[in-house]
Amino acid sequence: MDYAKTIVNELGQTLSSISERNTENLIDMIEGADRVFLAGCGRSGLMVRGFAMRLMHMGKKVFVVGETTTPSINQQDLLIIASGSGETGSLVAMANKCKKIGASLATVTIFPQATIGKLANCVVIIDAPTAKSQQKTAITSIQPMGSLFEQSLLLYFDSII
């Protein structure tokens, strides 16, 4: 049970470090978009699917990129990419296409200076260290791989509904 308490404390630290200004900007972008498209790979992709469902329940037109019924994005739309690294190849390609079309782009990431972060109109940083990150942070994690980022992503998305 101590392990679970430690994880809950990690999540509290991580979520409390997220910028309120950037969160408000993301909410404004969601509210202002005709349609919202969501993308993520692996476990981050699972978290965006949950967020898509919540947005749909609120009456927003929302699509998960890669599903068979997802239409093409246009200039009045918003693409939100969840990527811890900000460098996942397929997600970078989506970000580039989004910018080429003229749609808005937001990302939730650990690394704001990564390729997707540099392309985005809005960057929400989740300061969740991973084994791959070389950055020094006040937040540490006992969890493997990107677990803290992925868990924080789920809670963050639920908190902005």
Regions found by a protein language model. Name each.
Residues S17-G32:
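A short, well-structured juxtamembrane/interface segment
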Residues F37-C41, M47-L155, I161:
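Glycine-rich phosphate-binding loops that contact phosphosugars or nucleotide phosphates
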Residues A4-T6, D28-A33, S72-Q75, V92-A93:
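A short alpha-helix capping/helix-coil boundary motif
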Residues M1-S17:
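Generic N-terminal amphipathic, Lys/Arg-enriched alpha-helix
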